Amino acid sequence: FTYLKKWYPGANVQILSASKEKFRNLGIKEPIIDIKHKKYKDDHECTKFKYLKLSNNKKFDFYLIIPVISDPFEINDFKKMVPHATEWNTYTMSEYNDTDTSPVDFPIGVGKNHLGLFFDKSILEKQNIIKNPYAVVYIQSSGDGLLHSRYCFLSFVEMVISKTKYKSFKTFEVVIPYWIVEDINEYYPFKKKCLEIFKKYYNEIHLVTKDESIELYNSKRINCKRIDSKRINSKRINSNKTSKKQSNKTSKKQNNKTHKKIILRGDILPQSREKFIGFIQGSIKDILLTGDESLVDTLNCCKGKTIWYHIAPWKKNLAENLYSETGNKNYKTYKTSCGNMKGYKFKNDIDKLIKENDFRIKGKARFDSALICFHENNNNKESV
C-alpha cells in the first residue's frame, strides 16, 4: 500500500480487507472497504470469494490480491465478489517464498525468481519500559501448528545466557509472547526445563504476567532454608559450633558470588508496530523471530542484529533461501535456526540479502509492466 502510494502519487489506492483492525494496528488510517461474509459474522479471512461481499461496490481499474489463498487462483471465483474483474485488471501476489500457491504474478520473497522483501525506512517509538539489558523473543506457539516452539525458545535462551558478552548483566530480561507464560504456568515439564537452564547462571528467576510478578526461583531463600535445617540438626546432636562454621562458610560463598537475576516479561507483547520496532531496536544483538513482518522490520531498523529464525513448516522455503543469500548455515535446519551452542562465529551477509532482494527495485519494474499492459489493453479495442 505504501509503495503504491509513493510510486503512483496520482492514483487512488484503496484497501479492501476482511481484517480492518490489522491495518489500523500498522498505522494505516486511510479508509478501508470491508469485505464481509454473505451469511456469517465470524472470521472469514481464508474464505473463497464467492461467499464474500464488499461493503462498498465502488469500481476500481486495477486489483491486486495479496496473499493468494487458493491454488491456483481462480478469476471466476473473484468475479463472484467483483463482477467487472478480468485477467487484464486482476493480479496476484504470494506470501514470502510461498510455494503452495504458485504461479502468481508477484512472487515476493528471497532468492532467485522472487521479487524481494518489503524494505522501507523504519518508523519507531523508542521503548522506555525496560531499563535493564533485554532480549526479544517473538515466535508462534505449538498450538499454531508448530511442534518445536518450546524447543526453539529453550535453544535461544540457553545460547544467549551462555554468551560471555551477556554474562556480566546482573539483571537480564527477556520479552516473551504470552503463550510462553501460559506454558510455564500450566505445563510442568516445560517449566522444569526452563528452570534447569536458568539456574546455571542466575540466582533469581522471575516471571512477569499482565497481572502479577511471580518468583519462580531464589537461591537465597533456598540457602536460608538449608542453613536453618543444618542448625536444627546440629542442636539435636549437640554440635552447634560446627553448624555455625558451616553456615558462615556458606554465607561467605554466597556473598562473594555476584547475585544475578533473570526476568521473563510476558506483560509487554503485543504492541503496535512502531512500539514493537522500538523494542527490537533497544534489545541485545541476538533476537528470535518468526513470520514475515517482524523479520523485515528487524532488517529495516537494525541490520546489525543477528536474527535467529523459528522455521514454520510453511516457511521452510524462506529459511532455505535466507541461508543461500546470507550464507548463515544456522538457517539450514530448525535444530540450529533458533540458537546454536556449538559455535557463535558464522557467515551472515545481511548487506547482500538487502541489496539483492529489495522489492522497491524488483517489484517496481514488474508493477510498471503490469500497468502498461493494462493501459494498452484498455485503450486497444482489438485486444482480446
Regions found by a protein language model. Name each.
Residues T86-R150, Y178:
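A nucleotide-sugar donor-handling region in carbohydrate enzymes
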Residues F49, L54, Y202-K220, K225, ...:
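Donor nucleotide-activated moiety binding/catalytic core segment of transferases
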Residues L16-S17, I65-V68, Y91, Y138-I139, ...:
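Short His-Asn-centered micro-motif
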Residues F1-P9, H148-T164:
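Histidine-anchored nucleotide/phosphate-binding helix
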Residues N218-K257, E382-V384:
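Compositionally biased low-complexity segments enriched in polar/charged residues
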Residues I361-V384:
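C-terminal alpha-helical cap of glycosyltransferases
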Residues S283-I284, T290-I361:
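Catalytic binding pocket for nucleotide-activated donors in carbohydrate/polymer assembly enzymes
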Residues F1-P107, W179-I184:
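Active-site and donor-binding regions of nucleotide-sugar-utilizing enzymes
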